Amino acid sequence: MKKTFFYLFAIFCCFAMCLVSCEKPQTGGGGEDDELEDVVLPEGTIRLQALTSQYGSGPDMGYSNASHNFLLMFATEDCEVIEGEPFGNGDILVFELFSESAENILPAEGIYPIKDMEPIEDGMIVGGFDVEMGTPFGSYIQHMENDEFVGWDLVTGGAMEIKKTKKDGVLEFYIYTINEDGTEGYYYYRGKLLIENLSAIE
């Protein structure tokens, strides 16, 4: 009887921990329930639709030690990459990010604000938000300092530089952001493209 109770209690605890670890940060402007087909985006836009919950252990629900950290983006027109097939209009891109790669960095040579939309050395900008659009197209991105999670930044604008490496579909890209408080940010990510078009697996 005691063993049965212990097993049931252990199962309950595991279930409760799973529920907690799957909790998501709230996205700006209505979040990921927005009807994509009803959203009119400017030509050349990449939409950062959502940053999903982090699954892992550690401080702050594992945000700084995430083992599975996904970034979901929505391409609104054909977008080229340096290597590999271009992203097509309407493609939904799912990246698995390397947890150690999420960095908030200072403006660097070769990275340009969205208003300039100039090419980036060794890469190319494939899209961006109109910074005047504001929070309806906002999303939360984790803010890392010295490899530690310090909070969520609400991103209301962004540009993206992306390049595909030759090995295993690993991508490196920068995201230029206009944060909720009006400050600018540059985020560097490394990750693996898992799905190029969600509709292809329906």
Feature map (PLM): residue ranges:
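Bacterial Sec-dependent N-terminal signal peptides
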Residues: F15-Q49, N197-E202
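Intrinsic-disorder/low-complexity loop/linker signature
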Residues: E32-L36, E43, P59, S67, ...
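A mature extracytoplasmic/lumenal domain signature
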Residues: T52, S99-S101, K166, T177-N179
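Edge beta-strand at a domain terminus
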Residues: L41, L97, T156-M160, Y174-E202
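Short, hydrophobic/aromatic-rich segments at coil-to-beta transitions
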Residues: H68-L71, K167-Y174
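Sec-dependent bacterial lipoprotein signal peptides
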Residues: M1-S21
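Short, exposed beta-strand/loop patches in secreted or surface proteins that constitute
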Residues: L36-N65, G158-K166
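Surface-exposed helix/loop patches within compact recognition domains
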Residues: M61-K163
